[in-house]
Design a protein with these regions (language model features):
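Basic, alpha-helical nucleic-acid-binding regions used in initiation and control of genome expression
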Residues: 1-104
Length: 104
């Protein structure tokens, strides 16, 4: 598997876990909103503004679908995800260990 494919799969797995957590606790989306607000004070990257628009306008089901999507658009957005800090270190470690690159 090429390295970018592995990275995309790992990112998707992390965001699937984020989506599952948001289903149970929708208020956690405020972590992403706070991250974006903080990041936008020093970086006006278009993708951050795009995430802000998504978080302001998307319904929870639409947001969850985006986080779980394997589309190129979703993969592009996940590269600048505002969901840092939503998973606990233990949750993140468990996912990372399951998605380590395979050695030839």
């Amino acid at each position: 598997m090429r390295s970018h494919e592995w990275i995309d799969r790992r990112s998707l797995a992390l965001h699937e876990a984020v989506a599952t957590k948001l289903e149970a606790e929708p208020h956690l989306v405020n972590i992403a909103r706070a991250n974006l607000q903080r990041w936008l004070t020093t970086n006006s990257a278009a993708v951050l503004r795009e995430w802000r628009q998504i978080l302001e306008s998307a319904s929870l089901p639409d947001l969850l679908a985006l986080l779980r999507s394997s589309s190129e658009e979703a993969a592009r957005l996940r590269q600048s995800s505002p969901f840092a800090g939503l998973l606990t270190p233990e949750e993140r470690r468990a996912i990372m260990s399951r998605h380590e690159p395979r050695r030839p």
